[in-house]
Amino acid sequence: MNNRQITTLWSTLLVEALIRQGVDFFCISPGSRSTPLTIAAARNPRARTKLFADERSAAFFALGYARATEMVAPLICTSGTAVANYFPAVVEASMDFQPMLIISADRPFELLECGANQTIRQEHIFGSYTRWSMQLPTPSVEVPLTSLLSTVEYAVAKALNTPAGVVHLNQPFREPFEPESVAANNHAWWQSAQQWLASKAAHTTTTVEKKHPNNASITLLRQHLTTAKQPLLIAGSMRCKDDAEAVAALANNLKIPLYADFSSGLRMKSNLPPLQLLMQSPAWRAAFHPDVVLHFGGNVVAKHLATALREWQPAHYMVVREEPMRFSPDHNVTHRLEASIAATAHALHNSRSTPLWRESEADHFFAQAAQELEGDVVADQPITEISAARLISRHIGTEQALFVSNSMAVRDMDMYAASLHEAGIPTAINRGASGIDGILSTAAGFACGHGKSTTLLIGDIAFLHDLNALSLLGSLTVPLQIVLLNNNGGGIFSFLPIAACDDLFETYFATPQHYSIPLAAETFGLHYANPTTNSEFVAAYHQAQQSPQSTIIEVKSSRTNNLQHHRLLNARLQAIAAKLFNG
């Protein structure tokens, strides 16, 4: 067997090993050094592939796909800076425990650090942001076939299982790269390869059991819940819908208020009142004052909760999550349980039986708050950033998914969304590192993974940051409805103290852009709408939902007016709470 034949068969086996682990969607960026891997994926009848000119976009797409499916979509790229472009998405995936598998082609040993073209040190390039990385050998019949198979299968297991995250396989190849089939022969390596290919079975199957809480931990949590004067449940970021549903069921069983963050997937679920609206009220925080807080999952979007926890200083602040990483941003967690969220929540049912705290006042508040918010979506009123978020939450279909960008978009959805969907809506954000990069790409991957028409709420700076990702949408099998909140700059900075620095603010922080969104839509073959009223927005949104083609709905706003709108609305909501909860 010559080198070309060995490389072809090696790459075929590598891809087939992935397929037999349930991995069947590959994100490929064109390149010469990665030719053997690309051809192996393209020729495998069970592999699905998508091509990306930009590796950064590819990695964020794979991240979105993982958020939807809890499965890796292997990234294949050539050598050099191609692999480095994965880094932003690698950080996000690692920080938010999302599975990702990178297979980067590389130069062989003899071309490293000798001035060879397009050659960098790729092994361990992602540092501490990987769960595992491995430098694979250059394809050779001297390497036992079983070692290649078990390495690939272990890579998938490390990416998927707790703590899920990024795995990097760095695969060097020697030229030539073009495929060459191998005729039947007596070579032991070739024969073992054929036997494995014919077997149709995985070489290794990994089973990882859920971390179920032990009796002592459950007894402790139940005791704190039973004796609490006023408990509070928090649903932070979660990967699994079953976990989120279990936490919601626990809150209902125990009649304990539940703070359901947008990242939990519960925020728009019916029968879960948005505690976000109360959390910003000093009157409510002073009156409520929980002594026991049970926090499931990870972080939350709004700062109001952290402010409240600092004020309350609960005697017991307990966190339940599977990942073995520290989670205590304010260093106030008193007990941490590494266990299945769903199993823990189920085990805590019937811990207490007391009526909801000041249920009548809370019901009155949420009824009046809903009236205030509905006043913002009156048909003939101008469309605003707040009303756009609320109208999406009201009109998104049960068969759709929702992705929301960081910065103001997720804050508005977390705060002002309507809670109307009995079964909930598949939702996601990139909240691991909370960047605004790669949002369009991630949303496209999220839509692809779900196989559902997906709405994206995004600001103009995040939109421009990932503009080239619009090129992906034409080949998606499901459309995106991109609701673009365009306040001509970084609107969130208007809410920060730096806004008072008149000499610097506009140039260095607001950073206004003056690009034509309609021309961008035309360039990439997308539909475009620019509604000016709430009724026009609803009509444009409904039309986009019914279209097989992706649409950009541009909502133009003023940063100054948006800031004032938020302040006035929040002041009215706080006034309602003050009347009900003062004294």
UniProtKB/Swiss-Prot annotation:
<comment type="subunit">
    <text>Homodimer.</text>
</comment>
<keyword id="KW-0474">Menaquinone biosynthesis</keyword>
<dbReference type="InterPro" id="IPR012001">
    <property type="entry name" value="Thiamin_PyroP_enz_TPP-bd_dom"/>
</dbReference>
<comment type="pathway">
    <text>Quinol/quinone metabolism; 1,4-dihydroxy-2-naphthoate biosynthesis; 1,4-dihydroxy-2-naphthoate from chorismate: step 2/7.</text>
</comment>
<dbReference type="Pfam" id="PF16582">
    <property type="entry name" value="TPP_enzyme_M_2"/>
</dbReference>
<dbReference type="Pfam" id="PF02775">
    <property type="entry name" value="TPP_enzyme_C"/>
</dbReference>
<protein>
    <recommendedName>
        <fullName>2-succinyl-5-enolpyruvyl-6-hydroxy-3-cyclohexene-1-carboxylate synthase</fullName>
        <ecNumber>2.2.1.9</ecNumber>
    </recommendedName>
</protein>
<keyword id="KW-0460">Magnesium</keyword>
<dbReference type="InterPro" id="IPR004433">
    <property type="entry name" value="MenaQ_synth_MenD"/>
</dbReference>
<keyword id="KW-0786">Thiamine pyrophosphate</keyword>
<dbReference type="GO" id="GO:0070204">
    <property type="term" value="F:2-succinyl-5-enolpyruvyl-6-hydroxy-3-cyclohexene-1-carboxylic-acid synthase activity"/>
</dbReference>
<keyword id="KW-0479">Metal-binding</keyword>
<dbReference type="GO" id="GO:0009234">
    <property type="term" value="P:menaquinone biosynthetic process"/>
</dbReference>
<dbReference type="InterPro" id="IPR032264">
    <property type="entry name" value="MenD_middle"/>
</dbReference>
<dbReference type="GO" id="GO:0030145">
    <property type="term" value="F:manganese ion binding"/>
</dbReference>
<comment type="pathway">
    <text>Quinol/quinone metabolism; menaquinone biosynthesis.</text>
</comment>
<dbReference type="InterPro" id="IPR029061">
    <property type="entry name" value="THDP-binding"/>
</dbReference>
<dbReference type="GO" id="GO:0030976">
    <property type="term" value="F:thiamine pyrophosphate binding"/>
</dbReference>
<dbReference type="Pfam" id="PF02776">
    <property type="entry name" value="TPP_enzyme_N"/>
</dbReference>
<comment type="function">
    <text>Catalyzes the thiamine diphosphate-dependent decarboxylation of 2-oxoglutarate and the subsequent addition of the resulting succinic semialdehyde-thiamine pyrophosphate anion to isochorismate to yield 2-succinyl-5-enolpyruvyl-6-hydroxy-3-cyclohexene-1-carboxylate (SEPHCHC).</text>
</comment>
<dbReference type="InterPro" id="IPR029035">
    <property type="entry name" value="DHS-like_NAD/FAD-binding_dom"/>
</dbReference>
<dbReference type="GO" id="GO:0000287">
    <property type="term" value="F:magnesium ion binding"/>
</dbReference>
<dbReference type="InterPro" id="IPR011766">
    <property type="entry name" value="TPP_enzyme_TPP-bd"/>
</dbReference>
<comment type="similarity">
    <text>Belongs to the TPP enzyme family. MenD subfamily.</text>
</comment>
<keyword id="KW-0464">Manganese</keyword>
<keyword id="KW-0808">Transferase</keyword>
